Each structure stands twice: as C-alpha cells, then as structure tokens.
Amino acid sequence: MDSCCNFSLGTKTVLAKDSFKNVENKFLGEKIKGSVLKPFSSDLSSKKFRNRKLRPGVAYAIATSKNAKEALKNQPSMFERRRADPKNVAAIILGGGDGAKLFPLTKRAATPAVPVGGCYRMIDIPMSNCINSCINKIFVLTQFNSASLNRHLARTYFGNGINFGDGFVEVLAATQTPGEAGKKWFQGTADAVRKFLWVFEDAKNRNIENIIILSGDHLYRMNYMDFVQHHVDSKADITLSCAPVDESRASEYGLVNIDRSGRVVHFSEKPTGIDLKSMQTDTTMHGLSHQEAAKSPYIASMGVYCFKTEALLKLLTWRYPSSNDFGSEIIPAAIKDHNVQGYIYRDYWEDIGTIKSFYEANIALVEEHPKFEFYDQNTPFYTSPRFLPPTKTEKCRIVNSVISHGCFLGECSIQRSIIGERSRLDYGVELQDTLMLGADSYQTESEIASLLAEGNVPIGIGRDTKIRKCIIDKNAKIGKNVVIMNKDDVKEADRPEEGFYIRSGITVVVEKATIKDGTVI
C-alpha cells in the first residue's frame, strides 16, 4: 500500500534506522537530512528495532524514505505556522504629549509635527512604516498643539495618491465628556488609549486581532508585520520591541530582562545606580556577537508595543483601570500574569524626543555613510507634496550637507548642515553643524528690499552671518553680521525675549523669532 496514514494526536512515530538519509523535508520549520544506505526491510529485522518496547493499544506510525514526504506533508493544521494578516492589525500612533523635552520646538507644534531630515515631519516615520508594512488601519491620538499636525496629516495622507484600500487614517483628538472623570485630559499613554477603546467596538474594527502602539518621536525603518508575526508565533499577550543599548544611554529608557525563551521577566523604567546595574544582561543569547554584547549590555524597550486586542481591553478596563502609563505601570504589572515577549530589533533606532538627540540624529544624516537614511526605493518615507522648484545656488561651497527644495542660496558656505524648504541664505553666510527647518512661504524680492530699507529683517539669514551648532526653527528672521556660536559653551539658557534658548549646549532660535543685525550669541 503506497499511501501513508496521517499522524494524529497521541500517535507515536517510529523512525526506521537510516530512513531519512538523502531525504530533505520540513517539519515544524526544521530540516531533516540523510542518505538511504539500507532497505527498510533490514531495519525491521534489526535487533534494536525488535527489542524496542511498544505500548499496547497505542497506534504507531513508521516514517521511511518512501513515505516521509507525504507523511510530513499531511500533518494536522495545528502544526502549521499561522501567518499574521495585516488586515487584522490596527496601529495607534501616540501624538498627544506636551513635548516638554523638545521645547522650544514644540512651543506651537505637537512633537510629531516637528520637521525632521529637511522635508519630513516626525509623524511621517510611523505612518510610512505602517504603509510599507501593509497596515492600513491607523489611529493618530492628539492633544497638545495639534493644528499643524492635523493639517499635515490631511495634506499628506487624505487623498494624495496614497491608497489605503479598505483602510483609513483617523485622527482622534482629546475630548472632554460629561461627568467629573470626563473633564480630565489624557493622563498618560495608557490613559490616552483607554479613552478611545470604544472605537474597537465599531463593526469595521471587530476583526482586529492585534493592536500595535507606536510613538511619534522615533527615527527608524521597520517592517511592523515581522514584529506582529513574532507576536503571533510566540502566542504572546504583549510583545515589546527592544533594542540593545550601551551603558551611557541605558538610564534614559525602560530596560527589560529577557530569558532564553524570549519572555520578558523583568521591566524597570529608567533605572539608575544599583537598579541600573541589576538590569545588565548577556545580550549574546539574543543574537549579538561578543563584541556587540560588550558594547551594549542592556536591552531597552523602544516604546513600540503589540497587544492582543482582547488583552489590551482587559488590561485597561478591568485589571488596571487607574494606571495611566504603559512603560511605568501597565507593562511591569502585566509581566506577572501575562505572556509578555521581547522582540529584539537590531537595525537603526533612535528616540529623538529631546533637543540633544533630535539635533544629533539630524546632523548624522549628512555623514558619507549614515547609519540611517531616507533614501530607499522599496520602503520610501512619505510626506506632504509641496510642488516646489529646485534649489538655486550662486557660487556656494557646500560640504556634506542636505539641501531641501525651493531654497535660495547666495554666495555662502554650508558644512555638515541640513537646510529646510524655502530657506534663504544671503551672501557671505557661513553655516556649520546647523539644522535649519525652513519657511512656510516666500517673500518676494520687492518685499525683502522694502523690509531692509525700513531696517527690518526678512525671513532667512542675512549677509555675513556666521552660525555654528544651532537649530533654526521655521520662519526665523536672522539679520546681517550676526554671530551664533555659543563661544562660552553655555549648556542651558532661556532668552525668550531675545528669540532663543540653549539646550545641552545647542542654540535653538525659536519659530518666527527676529535676531537683529549685529547680535552675538
């Protein structure tokens, strides 16, 4: 009889000696190899096989080189790997924080609306990652200074050629409802999600099995479906995306300990001192080389989470209804009685939610071989189409810099800098290690001449101005013969009346500020 019986639960498999040699099969993702040297009949007569004790009443199956492929092919469906379906995944992007760490860039804009990389906004990072991962059900939660963020989302993702199929992008703004509890704004990341759990009761969202929760202030390129697949494979209730980090930055993040099975066994939010040392781990067991492990002995939570929808609903409404933050409250508590898994992400990832990290990540883009770049044909980053002309330059010296569209550059020098859209640099300007966020509109030649004649300062940078290690926010007006170099290496300073702040030694010229002719900072 040529056919082979199917293996069922309770069935024991007897492997005939040498029967799998020269045969390659896949069973539960593993490969079995060998070569047939003896006929099956000799195996049945072998002393070892005859002396094997078989339990009476239990069906045994014999897998040989002749029936192995068919037998393994006909396994029950419970042994097959379940593929995660992006149609059953929704993304929640958190964009409602007050942005205190990015102040003054967030003085008039939500953190996800802050420009990055010359022509993008921070929100474009998770949005583009979702689109490239085929996740087309996206919710954006907003609260503080959301006008520019809402405007950018509308211009970029609502009907501008980006096809969401049967998906959507919904902006969920913080609202107040009747009653004492309803008067409160979002109290944290978990509280923000809790207030909108009702959206998953809608008919169009009832098939959502997993929810990924994303931050709006990170710089990285990630296929979220690989992350969700790991979540499904490990049968996790919650999965944390994690990145190895060195000791100098470890205390800035929530740190985790992960056992060899991938389960998160301990979570500590931004530990210091002895608590920080206790979170040190051998990262070689998570795929790092000994050299990499010595450099990065900590595992940080990226603030990217995947929840089973059912688990998220229960945690936020029943188990921990008064907990407001995922990182410091929900996740540490859930580790005790839920399957919380860790997903090690080895590619570039940077939290750019502070002035220092934001500045350094942007300036790093101008390196000859940057660790991260926006240029990728297969996974592009999307942003609002501005329909701007190419940049015009006149006898400029430009070294290792990024120049966005629609700029006018006089006879100037630009080194290791990023110039945002519609920027204007006059003759003799020298920029070094500077991030210029650009302008929202142009001023005509006659308008500029009129302003200069009246002793006023037009948008852009005036003649013979020298700037180093600076962030220039949108629509700033910097006069001629200005020097911004922070020669005294001041680390922190607030000069709002003069139009600038200093954070971590980086000078930040605020949006629409006017720096008068001859000013020295």
Curated annotation (Swiss-Prot):
Pathway where it operates: Glycan biosynthesis; starch biosynthesis
Complexes and interactors: Heterotetramer.
UniProt entry keywords in alphabetical sequence: Allosteric enzyme, ATP-binding, Chloroplast, Nucleotide-binding, Nucleotidyltransferase, Plastid, Starch biosynthesis, Transferase, Transit peptide
Main location: plastid
Protein name per the record: Glucose-1-phosphate adenylyltransferase large subunit 3, chloroplastic
Function of the protein: This protein plays a role in synthesis of starch. It catalyzes the synthesis of the activated glycosyl donor, ADP-glucose from Glc-1-P and ATP.
Primary gene name: APL3
CDD domains the record matches: ADP_Glucose_PP, LbH_G1P_AT_C
A GO biological process held by the record: glycogen biosynthetic process
The reaction(s) this protein catalyses: alpha-D-glucose 1-phosphate + ATP + H(+) = ADP-alpha-D-glucose + diphosphate
GO MF annotation: an example: ATP binding
Family under the similarity heading: Belongs to the bacterial/plant glucose-1-phosphate adenylyltransferase family.
Natural source organism: Arabidopsis thaliana
Cellular location(s): Plastid, Chloroplast
